[in-house]
């Protein structure tokens, strides 16, 4: 529910009262259709597995708003992310790998706009190289990687953070792809998780940022060749993350000329006014 409040310094401002959280799980959905090994873990797609897990865990946190979970994929018209659908979305979860370049820039633009207005964005695993993640962070987002069926130990370094609720000191995934530092991202607002891999590398595997009015969470695990999204700890992290990332406000910024709050005194001098009127299309 959105409660709109008059405000002289913004075109449109809303306080979000969370009665339900609308989530879209976006997946390029390529590997599952092309690779038997991946399809064995995710017969209906990674997006379907994540969506099902979110629905099952939705009521496990006392007082948490219920979830409305839907999915979208690359091959749908407008990648399933129309303006109308994004306008209703509170949190967008993004998984991509081999088809980053196929995502239309116009869709990236509208996702960016919604994050800046307040929509939450959760980027998973190889989504670190997606257009939208690199756009929001403004860096290359590169890292080291290795596929060697390694154990990953994920340490909870901020146990009081809402995304870490219900987890122990650490949890382990028996097989995962290694990601290693340096992870070329801006300094995060918070580092919630730190991963250690069997080969010796470490990686900042749970990071948060704020961009505009929206919250962003990057979560490292999730290589398509492994059943990572069936893991209960991973599912708990995602369930916590959607509650954390859900918008608190929804603000469409338009750089308006603001009327004075107080009566202005008459001035004895006159200056030339050089003003350029800008509309939303100019921003």
Please give the residue ranges for each predicted region.
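N-terminal amphipathic/basic-hydrophobic helices that include classical n-h-c signal peptides
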Residues: 1-15
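Extracellular ligand-binding/catalytic regions of CAZymes and related secreted enzymes
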Residues: 14-20, 203, 211-283
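Short beta-strand segments enriched in small/hydrophobic residues
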Residues: 18-32
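Residue-level signal for short, function-critical loop segments
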Residues: 27-29, 98, 222
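Short, solvent-exposed loop/turn elements at domain surfaces
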Residues: 31-35, 201-202, 227-228
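Helical hinge/lid and interdomain linker segments adjacent to catalytic or ligand-binding clefts
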Residues: 35, 39-130, 282
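Catalytic beta-strand/loop cores that center a nucleophilic Ser/Cys/Thr
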Residues: 68, 143-218, 255, 269-274, ...
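A glycine-rich, often tryptophan-bearing local segment used as a flexible ligand/cofactor-contacting loop or short
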Residues: 99-167
């Amino acid at each position: 529910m959105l409660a709109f409040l008059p405000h002289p310094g913004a075109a449109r401002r809303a306080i979000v009262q969370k009665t339900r959280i609308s989530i879209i799980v976006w997946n390029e959905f390529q590997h599952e259709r092309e690779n038997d090994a991946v399809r064995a873990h995710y017969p209906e797609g990674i997006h379907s597995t994540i969506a099902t897990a979110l629905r099952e865990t939705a009521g496990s946190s006392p007082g948490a708003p219920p979830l409305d979970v839907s999915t979208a994929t690359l091959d749908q018209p407008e990648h399933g992310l129309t303006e109308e659908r994004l306008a209703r979305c509170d949190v967008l979860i993004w998984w991509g790998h081999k088809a980053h370049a196929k995502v239309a820039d116009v869709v990236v633009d509208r996702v960016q706009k919604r994050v800046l207005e307040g929509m939450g964005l959760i980027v998973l695993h190889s989504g670190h190289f997606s257009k939208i993640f690199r756009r929001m962070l403004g860096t290359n987002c590169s890292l080291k990687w290795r596929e060697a069926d390694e154990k990953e130990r994920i340490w909870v370094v901020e146990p009081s953070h809402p995304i870490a609720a219900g987890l122990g000191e650490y949890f382990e995934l028996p097989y995962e792809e290694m990601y290693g530092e340096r992870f070329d991202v801006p300094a995060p607002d918070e580092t919630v998780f730190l991963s250690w891999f069997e080969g010796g590398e470490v990686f900042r595997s749970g990071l948060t940022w704020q961009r505009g009015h929206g919250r962003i969470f990057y979560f490292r695990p999730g290589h398509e060749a492994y059943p990572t999204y069936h893991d209960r700890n991973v599912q708990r992290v995602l369930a916590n993350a959607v509650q954390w990332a859900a918008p608190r406000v929804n603000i469409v910024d338009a750089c308006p000329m603001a009327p004075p709050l107080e009566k202005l005194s008459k001035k004895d001098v006159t200056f030339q006014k050089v003003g350029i009127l800008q509309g939303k299309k100019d921003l």
